[in-house]
Amino acid sequence: MNILDKVDSAYLRDDVPAFRPGDTLDVHVKVIEGTNTRTQLFKGVVIRRQGSGIRETFTVRKVSFGIGVERTFPVHSPNLEKIEVVRRGDVRRAKLYYLRELRGKAARIKEKR
């Protein structure tokens, strides 16, 4: 293990659940507005997960008022209060970019049994 891995290991979270692309997540994000701190919920489908270690990120996509919204989060960020897996999706790809073009019921993902 080199020196960078030792430094990074101090910042790794141990409360991250196992999730994959296709899963639906509830991501509780800590939002700081001035002196106030509140929790904002972002619920959507994981369309990608990339990187490793402290640099690992995942992108969640949801449709809000007919407009697709994608947000990328660092997995080990201190601004994430918690990540909850709502349902497991059954997909055959690691990157679900094709969901960007699909609308309505076509954009649904089968639930894993």
UniProtKB/Swiss-Prot annotation:
GO terms for molecular function: structural constituent of ribosome. InterPro entries: Ribosomal_bL19, Ribosomal_bL19_CS, Ribosomal_bL19_sf, Translation_prot_SH3-like_sf. The keyword Iron does not apply. It holds the Pfam family Ribosomal_L19. The keyword Glycosyltransferase does not apply. Gene3D superfamilies: 2.30.30.790. GO terms for biological process: translation. Keywords: Ribonucleoprotein, Ribosomal protein. It comes from the Bacteria. GO terms for cellular component: cytosolic large ribosomal subunit. Disulfide bonds: none annotated. PROSITE patterns: RIBOSOMAL_L19. Belongs to the bacterial ribosomal protein bL19 family. HAMAP family: Ribosomal_bL19. PANTHER family: LARGE RIBOSOMAL SUBUNIT PROTEIN BL19M (PTHR15680:SF9), RIBOSOMAL PROTEIN L19 (PTHR15680). This protein is located at the 30S-50S ribosomal subunit interface and may play a role in the structure and function of the aminoacyl-tRNA binding site. This is Large ribosomal subunit protein bL19. The gene is rplS.
